[in-house]
Amino acid sequence: MDRTAKADLVSTLNGVFNESAVVVVAHYKGLTVADMQKLRAQMKQAGATVKVAKNSLAGIALDGTDVASIKPLLKGPTLLAYSGDPVAAAKVAVDFAKANDKLVILGGAMGKTALNPDGVKALASLPSLDELRAKIVGLVQAPATKIAQVVNAPASKLARVFGAYAKKDEAA
């Protein structure tokens, strides 16, 4: 790799580290090419990316970024998994590591917060942004649905509801 290619890689990685919500570092020694392709496909499906880069170049790219705390983890055959979703890369990496013991999670960073392997596993157990958005939409729609059900209910059901409230007030 010539000097300009190295400079381009460092620049690209620096941009990735600045834009990513989470970066996970893992050892991949012993993974087959098929395993790496499977990991890359799973990451891509989740909206995350896996990159294998020379540790010294990745270390240079980390300088001045929020995730610079992962620099000491860059020893040996390491891969970097990153995503804009704070949970996606961690979730895929942890799930893949459970199925394949050759992938060893070393740690990671979420913004300026350094994560140890247990922190990455805890992050992976959280719901993704899409899941949280779906829950919020469901919670917002629930009251509207209930109002629509009451408005559309037959008059007899409404009479029973009002009668029940009247009996409740008399009993109290």
UniProtKB/Swiss-Prot annotation:
<dbReference type="InterPro" id="IPR002363">
    <property type="entry name" value="Ribosomal_uL10_CS_bac"/>
</dbReference>
<dbReference type="GO" id="GO:0015934">
    <property type="term" value="C:large ribosomal subunit"/>
</dbReference>
<protein>
    <recommendedName>
        <fullName>Large ribosomal subunit protein uL10</fullName>
    </recommendedName>
</protein>
<comment type="similarity">
    <text>Belongs to the universal ribosomal protein uL10 family.</text>
</comment>
<comment type="subunit">
    <text>Part of the ribosomal stalk of the 50S ribosomal subunit. The N-terminus interacts with L11 and the large rRNA to form the base of the stalk. The C-terminus forms an elongated spine to which L12 dimers bind in a sequential fashion forming a multimeric L10(L12)X complex.</text>
</comment>
<comment type="function">
    <text>Forms part of the ribosomal stalk, playing a central role in the interaction of the ribosome with GTP-bound translation factors.</text>
</comment>
<keyword id="KW-0699">rRNA-binding</keyword>
<dbReference type="InterPro" id="IPR001790">
    <property type="entry name" value="Ribosomal_uL10"/>
</dbReference>
<dbReference type="InterPro" id="IPR047865">
    <property type="entry name" value="Ribosomal_uL10_bac_type"/>
</dbReference>
<keyword id="KW-0689">Ribosomal protein</keyword>
<dbReference type="GO" id="GO:0003735">
    <property type="term" value="F:structural constituent of ribosome"/>
</dbReference>
<keyword id="KW-0687">Ribonucleoprotein</keyword>
<dbReference type="GO" id="GO:0006412">
    <property type="term" value="P:translation"/>
</dbReference>
<dbReference type="InterPro" id="IPR043141">
    <property type="entry name" value="Ribosomal_uL10-like_sf"/>
</dbReference>
<dbReference type="InterPro" id="IPR022973">
    <property type="entry name" value="Ribosomal_uL10_bac"/>
</dbReference>
<keyword id="KW-0694">RNA-binding</keyword>
<dbReference type="Pfam" id="PF00466">
    <property type="entry name" value="Ribosomal_L10"/>
</dbReference>
<dbReference type="GO" id="GO:0070180">
    <property type="term" value="F:large ribosomal subunit rRNA binding"/>
</dbReference>
